[in-house]
Amino acid sequence: MPAKLSVNLNAVAMLRNRRDLPWPSVTGLGRAALAAGAAGLTVHPRPDQRHIRFSDLGDIRALIDDEFPQAEFNIEGFPSEAFLDLVEKHQPEQVTLVPDDPTQATSDHGWDFVSRSDFLAPIVARLKAGGMRVSLFADPDPLGYERAAAIGVDRVELYTGPYGATYDDPAAATRELDRLEKAANAATALGLDINAGHDLTVDNLPALVKRIPQLSEVSIGHGLTADALMYGMPVTVSRYIAALA
């Protein structure tokens, strides 16, 4: 079964926030993505609300519940108490925990599972008790994956930024794919499902899914939004789904 596509709406929200105006509509483009076949929507609300606003979360939850009940809502973020309160309020199907500093422009590394498993364990338990699937952002290095499995995580999301950066270097792309494949196989052996995200595009997805056929989901924002400016959201989503096939 092909990996599912979750459309990250942060870039849409960032464009909206350049003006004190309600467009482009985050929920409007989310609706277009889901209508075109996306399996879910992803957001990463940061404390300063520089792209996704806290008020967007209820709107997206309502959009999915009212119009696309088969779709999933994925909320990413560092597990501060404020973040945990947000996800417990809006009940996404999946919570993806990332080790970001709040001032970071974007997620650029995974968790150190060896040193942070004691911090993460009660958070994972709390979210799972609330009925949410939990994924942890992970570097493509299997060191410590057994710690992630031991604390009850459902999935790891492989950080694909270094792979995305090899768009003009085929040899480097092959090396990064080797790392990702090895990491994915190690996670699968531990009973973890695999997500992936960061700098994925129509061009680099086919090689990734060929190497990791067990991939459950990709969340894509920047590249997909850039393509949507050229082709429109419905056509763009269709192209990404085809790239995952």
From Swiss-Prot:
InterPro entries per the UniProt record, alphabetical: Aldolase_TIM (IPR013785), PyrdxlP_synth_PdxJ (IPR004569), Pyridoxine-5'_phos_synth (IPR036130)
GO function terms (MF aspect): pyridoxine 5'-phosphate synthase activity
Site feature Transition state stabilizer, where: E157
Binding-site positions, 1-deoxy-D-xylulose 5-phosphate: R46, H51, T106
EC number: 2.6.99.2
Alphabetical GO biological process terms: pyridoxine biosynthetic process
Binding site for 3-amino-2-oxopropyl phosphate: N8, R19, D199, G221, H222
Gene3D superfamilies per record: Aldolase class I
Catalytic activity: 3-amino-2-oxopropyl phosphate + 1-deoxy-D-xylulose 5-phosphate = pyridoxine 5'-phosphate + phosphate + 2 H2O + H(+)
HAMAP family tied to this protein: PdxJ (MF_00279)
Subunit structure: Homooctamer; tetramer of dimers.
Cross-referenced PANTHER family: PYRIDOXINE 5'-PHOSPHATE SYNTHASE
Protein family (similarity comment): Belongs to the PNP synthase family.
Name of protein: Pyridoxine 5'-phosphate synthase
The species this protein was found in: Brucella anthropi (strain ATCC 49188 / DSM 6882 / CCUG 24695 / JCM 21032 / LMG 3331 / NBRC 15819 / NCTC 12168 / Alc 37)
